Curated annotation (Swiss-Prot):
It comes from the Bacteria. It is an enzyme of class 7 (translocase). F-type ATPases have 2 components, CF(1) - the catalytic core - and CF(0) - the membrane proton channel. CF(1) has five subunits: alpha(3), beta(3), gamma(1), delta(1), epsilon(1). CF(0) has four main subunits: a(1), b(1), b'(1) and c(9-12). It catalyses: ATP + H2O + 4 H(+)(in) = ADP + phosphate + 5 H(+)(out). InterPro entries: ATP_synth_asu-like_sf (IPR023366), ATP_synth_asu_C (IPR000793), ATP_synth_asu_C_sf (IPR038376), ATP_synth_F1_a_nt-bd_dom (IPR033732), ATP_synth_F1_asu (IPR005294), ATPase_a/bsu_AS (IPR020003), ATPase_F1/V1/A1_a/bsu_N (IPR004100), ATPase_F1/V1/A1_a/bsu_N_sf (IPR036121). Belongs to the ATPase alpha/beta chains family. One of its GO terms (molecular function) is proton-transporting ATP synthase activity, rotational mechanism. HAMAP family: ATP_synth_alpha_bact. It comes from Synechococcus sp. (strain ATCC 27144 / PCC 6301 / SAUG 1402/1). The record marks 363 as: Required for activity. This is ATP synthase subunit alpha. Signal peptide: none annotated.
């Protein structure tokens, strides 16, 4: 028989008491009252913050948006098919974040940073809040460096600077995305990190864009954030903020970044859907009252930082789709008032064969002229005016039968300028080529060339400069100026190419 000694028992109990550590865990828990249409109403969650992430029993994450007296309205970031009435919900104590780092470059991610390209996990170095405050006035510098798009019509007449917000607006199928993609392609070798945010687009369209970027080597400096049409409205609403957070990571490291939001109309529609389901009062066009703030807080994050903060920049190119050219609708007017200018694409011009279909009359850049390179500023001053006058005269000439010689000359010049600015997709021009093309048109050096030969003249001139006058390209590209020596070289090249074109006609 084993004898039990009381002192042994007491020492064991004492030992266990010493080892016991009281770990009190307080959790903020609620109960699902109702779920459906991507919205959950939750009872409890007394301590929840606005915008805080909440976790449901089945692992689905949501964001608490409506904090009411007796319940919390949360939007789901997944299907949420297994969430049941009466199941528990936990508050996480975190606001939505995205993992960021250099490893994101070249990848396709969801608005929450999950990889979508099948290339494995992303080794992120830190997390950034998806919504973060915009830089203040002291933290900024005025826009003074050019962001070349490679599209002659834009760089000559509607120049964009680093840190600017320039809206691309137009009807569907007018080439809005094409301009954005061309701008990304033109950043090759410029040490600019590009972020392309696809909101509510077809997965096939996004796949095509990624393929174009990969083929032309642009994916090496681009991050794609995709919230496709099949994704919940919550992810489509978050996608632009996630793109801005990724760009901010690089901007605060002193890099130049370019963000394209394609397009913010779909984000506004996703937000309207969420707001109506949350029973928020509808306003104009059934959008909620804070839809202006939705876009302003996003676009204000674009900035050119002061030298004290590293001098990085974030240039934003938001895209807005209009209905039948109506720029006075609610969302277009909101975004026009927030941005520093707009590039308006017209379906009439597009259908008439002018690509890119930029309506020069109502397109404007409010701050970009300060950033325009001297070479193109020197020669493109009159270009916008001449094209605007040509549009007026062309409308008038339809009714007038006999026109005086000066008017005929002006119409002829305008037609040739129009042809000069035509540019095929995915073929951005370098600065020296743009200078050459605009110079030839503005100085009247192609007035004798037939209109149908102008496109041939442009391609001939580009190849001639590359092969026979490389010193002109070198001079303009390095100094960003058109001095007398470079101008003399350019005149020779234009005369030579013109002679060849006229001889062949």
């Amino acid at each position: 028989m084993v004898s039990i000694r009381p002192d042994e028992i007491s020492s064991i109990i004492r030992q266990q008491i010493e080892q016991y550590s009281q770990d009190v865990k307080v959790e903020n828990v609620g109960t699902v009252l109702q779920v459906g249409d991507g919205i959950a109403r939750i009872y409890g969650l007394q301590q929840v913050m606005s915008g805080e992430l909440v976790e449901f029993e089945d692992g689905t994450t949501g964001i608490a948006l409506n904090l009411e007296e007796d319940n919390v309205g949360a939007v789901l970031m997944g299907e949420g098919r297994n969430i049941q009435e009466g199941s528990t919900v936990k508050a996480t104590g975190k606001i939505a974040q995205i993992p960021v780092g250099d490893a994101l470059v070249g990848r396709v991610v969801s608005p929450l940073g999950a990889p979508l390209d099948g290339k494995g996990e992303i080794a992120a170095t830190e997390n950034r809040l998806i919504e973060s405050p915009a830089p203040g006035i002291i933290a900024r510098r005025s826009v003074h460096e050019p962001m070349q798009t490679g599209i002659t019509a834009i760089d000559a007449m509607i120049p964009i600077g680093r840190g600017q917000r320039e809206l691309i607006i137009g009807d569907r199928q007018t080439g809005k995305t094409a301009i954005a993609i061309d701008t990304i392609l033109n950043q090759k070798g410029e040490d600019v990190i590009c972020v392309y945010v696809a909101i509510g687009q077809k997965a096939s369209s996004v796949a095509n864009i990624i393929e174009v970027l990969r083929e032309r080597g642009a994916l090496d400096y681009t991050v794609v954030v995709a919230a496709n049409a099949s994704e919940p409205a919550t992810l489509q609403y978050l996608a632009p903020y996630a793109g801005a957070a990724i760009a901010e990571y690089f901007m605060y490291k002193g890099k130049a970044t370019l963000v394209i939001y394609d397009d913010l109309t779909k984000q506004a529609q996703a937000y309207r859907q969420m707001s109506l389901l949350l029973r928020r009062p509808p306003g104009r066009e059934a959008y909620p009252g804070d839809v202006f703030y939705l876009h302003s807080r996003l676009l204000e994050r674009a900035a050119k930082l002061s030298d004290a903060l590293g001098g990085g920049s974030m240039t934003a190119l938001p895209v807005i789709e209009t209905q039948a050219g109506d720029v006075s609708a609610y969302i277009p007017t909101n975004v026009i008032s927030i941005t520093d200018g707009q590039i308006f694409l017209s379906s009439d011009l597009f259908n008439s064969g002018l690509r890119p279909a930029i309506n020069v009359g109502i397109s404007v850049s409010r701050v970009g002229s300060a950033a325009q390179t001297k070479a193109i500023k020197k020669i493109a001053g009159t270009l916008k005016l001449e094209l605007a006058q040509f549009d007026e005269l062309a409308a008038f000439a339809q009714f007038a039968s006999d026109l005086d010689k000066a008017t005929q000359n002006q119409l002829a010049r305008g037609q040739r300028l129009r042809e000069l600015l035509k540019q095929p997709q995915f073929s951005p021009l370098i600065l020296a080529e743009q200078v050459a093309v605009v110079y030839a048109g503005v100085k009247g050096l192609i007035d004798e060339i037939p209109v149908n030969q102008v496109t041939a003249f442009v391609s001939e001139l580009r190849s001639y400069l590359k092969t026979s006058k490389p010193e002109f390209i070198e001079k303009v590209q390095s100094s960003k100026q058109l001095d007398d020596a470079a101008e003399a070289l350019l005149k020779e090249a234009i005369a030579e190419v013109k002679k060849n074109i006229l001889a062949a006609v």
